Amino acid sequence: MNKNKQELLKAIRMGELKIMNPISFIIDEICDCLLMDKYVAATTATNLLLEETLKLALIIFDSQGKTLDDDVEFENMYQTEVEHNIEKDLYVNIEKAFHVGLIDDKEKEKLHRIRKQFRNPFSHGSHNEAVKCAQTLIAIANISDVQNIQYKKVPVKNQPLLYYLAKHEFLKRESLRYFLNVYHYIVSLDQKLQSLYLW
């Protein structure tokens, strides 16, 4: 195992989120998956993390720093905010996070890019553009002339065996980077949301 990767994931697990702490269990499970080289599981869990991050951030933002001191029953403290945000899909939540100022225009575009690149293909089974356009080298030989092997570059999109091999290779290369991008947003949102609780 890559020692740098191991140290990085250990540091993330030990990181302290204040406002976004309720989703730490998902972060821990993603770290476990990445440490065990379970790239599909890590990516799928990161998709969940991205969705839950935006929903939680919007619920907290909409509450504008509501605390137990506000004379509200604990179990109903965020009822309105939850009802308003919980059923929204990722696209809508990215747009809303931008509209309320939790993310800027550049972050919004990046989140939409990673939504298209990772969430849709790996949570919904649609084609990933990076993989769909991939090519691979295959060997072509004739059984009667095994010495004459030719190599040909072919697209993977029309051959399920090649497509899924390419998809797996893509996740091996990109799942850690995807998680780190999402984690960066969590830390950034956590810091922004802390300002709601500073008097």
Residue ranges, per PLM feature:
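Charged alpha-helical initiation segments
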Residues: 1-40, 65
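Amphipathic, non-membrane alpha-helical segments in soluble helical-bundle scaffolds
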Residues: 13-20, 36-43, 47, 80-87, ...
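Amphipathic, well-ordered alpha-helical segments in soluble domains
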Residues: 22-26, 52, 118
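Short, hydrophobic, well-ordered secondary-structure elements
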Residues: 27-31, 35-59
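Amphipathic alpha-helical scaffolding segments
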Residues: 47-51, 66-68, 137-143
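Short amphipathic alpha-helical interaction/hinge segments
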Residues: 54-61, 65, 123-126, 130
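Flexible secondary-structure boundary motifs
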Residues: 59-112, 142, 158-159
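Charge-enriched, short contiguous segments at helix-coil
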Residues: 101-199
